[in-house]
A protein has these predicted regions:
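Charged DNA-binding/catalytic regions of mobile-element recombinases
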Residues: 1-281
């Protein structure tokens, strides 16, 4: 009985209209097989919820349990989580901000046209930049996302909105993945992507440049979706006092959680790393 530690047994028996002997007989009765199973499931549900940093709600907890071999229905998972007071992190409202085009820089055509599909890794990369607010000021985050697995293959941060932060993210992605010529790189028309240094690096590796239409963030929707997840699942739940703290939080989310373990609905509820291992090997 869940309130037996808060109130005297006699008081509980009077409120519930049962005798003391009946209460003790009920408490000493051996648990049923389903009760034992529920205890085991609750322990595993708590573990999955904890491993997700408290992010997963019942749909993703259910998928994680099924992947681990547990024969359980999604409604039972939702009920057990509700009884245990477990819930996913509610997403805050997220506002998309269009990047202004640098009028003096050339723009590549939109070769993607919102067809965010790739048959293999390193066929289509998406690049984007966002701002993270801290008490110290803005932190600028640049990412490279592989559309095939939604994996973040390169990222970098800077205290200032310099072109070098996007260039550093691209350098990291190229060094990690070593893509073959013909890879399509899609971004907005911001100056960070149209500048000479960035375009030279793309040309050096035979990477084909593609750019969104002016002021249309949906032309780069998966990258925007990643920023939404990063902020609503993670960053918005912290008070970020400094850029160093913010960068540490970004590192933990991308390298410790998102790439390795976060279940992605577009990947059949697998993580980017799991999906690449499953499909490529």
């Amino acid at each position: 009985m869940e309130h037996s530690r808060e109130f005297p047994i006699g008081q509980l028996c009077r409120v519930l209209g049962v005798s003391r002997s009946g209460f003790y007989a009920w408490r000493q009765r051996p648990r049923s097989a389903r009760d034992q199973e529920s205890l085991t499931l609750v322990a595993r549900i708590r573990a999955v919820h904890r491993e997700s940093r408290g992010i997963y709600g019942s749909p993703r907890v259910y998928r994680a349990l099924r992947a681990a071999g547990y024969a359980i229905g999604k409604h039972r998972v939702a009920r057990l989580m509700r009884l245990e007071g477990l819930r996913g992190r509610a997403a805050r409202r997220f506002r998309f901000i269009a990047t202004r085009r640098s009028a003096d820089l050339p723009a590549a055509p939109n070769r993607v046209a919102r067809h965010f599909h790739a048959a293999a890794p390193n066929r289509l990369w998406l690049a984007d930049i966002t701002q993270v607010r801290t008490r110290e000021g803005w932190l600028f985050l640049a990412i490279i996302l592989d559309v095939f697995s939604r994996r973040i293959v390169g990222w970098a941060t800077s205290a200032r909105p310099e072109q070098t932060v996007a260039l550093e993210a691209l350098h990291i992605a190229v060094a990690r993945r070593r893509p073959e010529a013909g890879l399509v790189h899609h971004s907005d028309r911001g100056g960070s992507y149209g500048c000479a240094n960035y375009q030279e690096l793309l040309d050096q590796h035979g990477i084909v440049c593609s750019m969104s239409r002016p002021g249309n963030c949906l032309d780069n929707a998966p990258a925007e979706s990643f920023f939404h997840s990063l902020k609503t699942e993670w960053l918005y739940h912290f008070i970020l006092y400094s850029r160093v703290q913010a960068r540490s939080c970004v590192f933990e989310y991308i390298e410790g959680f998102y790439n390795r373990t976060r279940l992605h609905s577009a990947l059949g509820y697998r993580s980017p790393e799991q999906y690449e291992k499953l499909v490529v090997t």
